């Protein structure tokens, strides 16, 4: 088995899915932005230094989040981010897809898995990352995801064990025994955590002693000032574009590890800005094509509207990373003590 990135067939399937979106699904999707991203929780560097407690994302298990992801996954599959994450720049000469592959090799190395070990992907999407990690390590993959449509896609993948993938919610008790896994990882779903103590505690519980927990997700950086209107606007635009929930200073992530009992092995942020520029340019082209096709009545206007809504204010995303207000790739590695 050799890992393959998103194919033309995948993209055509996503386009067909978008063209089949009902009016009810369309209106539900468009309404999720106000429901999910208005007054989302933030904890900045200043909050951390003042001892302000972490405020979780209360809508992390909501029906609105499921509705959002049913459509967002289709839109992302048109580009390079079917796996639902923007990778850090590992090799600037390579594509977004190739940098995802390089990044996943780093994750596989961090997980320290052997053949036959069990590894859990939290927020596994359609299982594409799990498939690659299994290929790299020889481990047996498991995954949970809130969106049933993506789990259905994982079930159709002949390279994944169907019974190991399920609709699940990391804001609730994980339906696995204590010490069930040799490693756990989460690639950009963790801003939907409602209660960090609970979720990190559940990860700790299902890990074997010595097991690794690797997380890569959005974090606020030192430069972000919530009282600066310009910066606050950039972050809000980026939140809506990349659909992250809570926005927390990276030290809060580190504390979530250590308070759960993990030994923090490493914690580092990486830039994705060059990857972001490429993907934004691609979706700008998609937006222009969709607008034209809708104008001449080849595709429904609602298909064009969904693309425009997702790609709205995309330049803010680039600017926010360039100003070092945030990273989409704060990478933490923790180990459960032996």
State each model region's role.
Residues 2-76:
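N-terminal auxiliary segments of SAM/dcSAM-dependent transferases
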Residues 97-115:
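Conserved alpha-helix/loop element of class I SAM-dependent methyltransferases that forms part
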Residues 116-123:
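Conserved class I S-adenosyl-L-methionine
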Residues 120, 129-172:
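Class I SAM-dependent methyltransferase SAM/SAH-binding core
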Residues 171-184:
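A short acidic, Gly/Pro-enriched loop at the edge of an enzyme's catalytic core
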Residues 183-194:
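A short SAM/SAH-binding and catalytic strip from SAM-dependent methyltransferases
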Residues 197-212:
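A short glycine-rich, Lys/Arg-flanked "PGG" loop and its adjoining helix->strand segment in the class I
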Residues 227-229, 233-322, 326, 337:
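Substrate-binding/catalytic lobe of Class I Rossmann-like enzymes that use SAM or dcSAM, i.e.
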């Amino acid at each position: 088995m050799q890992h393959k990135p998103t194919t033309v067939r995948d993209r055509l399937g996503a386009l067909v899915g978008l063209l089949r979106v009902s009016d009810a699904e369309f209106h539900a999707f468009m309404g999720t932005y106000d429901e999910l991203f208005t007054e989302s929780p933030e904890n900045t560097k200043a909050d951390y230094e003042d001892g302000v407690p972490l405020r979780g994302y209360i809508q992390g298990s909501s029906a609105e989040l499921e509705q959002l992801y049913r459509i967002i996954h289709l839109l992302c599959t048109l580009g390079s981010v079917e796996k639902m994450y923007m990778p850090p720049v590992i090799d600037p000469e390579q594509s977004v897809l190739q940098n995802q592959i390089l990044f996943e090799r780093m994750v596989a190395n961090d997980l320290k898995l052997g053949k036959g070990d069990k590894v859990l992907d939290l927020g596994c999407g359609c299982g594409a990352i799990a498939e690659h990690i299994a290929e790299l390590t020889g481990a047996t993959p498991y995954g949970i995801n809130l969106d049933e449509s993506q789990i259905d896609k994982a079930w159709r993948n002949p390279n994944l064990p169907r019974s190991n993938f399920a609709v699940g919610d990391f804001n609730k008790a994980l339906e696995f025994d204590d010490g069930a896994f040799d490693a756990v990882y989460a690639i950009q779903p963790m801003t939907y955590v409602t209660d960090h103590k609970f979720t990190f505690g559940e990860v700790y519980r299902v890990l074997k002693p010595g097991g690794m927990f690797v997380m890569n997700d959005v974090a606020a950086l030192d430069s972000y000032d919530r009282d600066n209107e310009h910066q606050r606007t950039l972050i809000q635009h980026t939140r809506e574009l990349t659909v992250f929930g809570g926005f927390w200073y990276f030290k809060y992530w580190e504390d979530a590890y250590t308070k759960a009992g993990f030994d923090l092995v490493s914690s580092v942020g990486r830039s994705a800005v060059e990857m972001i520029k490429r993907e934004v340019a691609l979706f700008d082209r998609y937006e222009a094509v969709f607008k034209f096709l809708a104008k001449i009545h080849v595709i429904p206007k609602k298909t064009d509207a969904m693309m425009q809504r997702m790609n709205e204010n995309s330049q803010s995303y680039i600017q926010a990373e360039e100003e070092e207000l945030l990273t989409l790739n704060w990478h933490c590695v923790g180990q459960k003590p032996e």
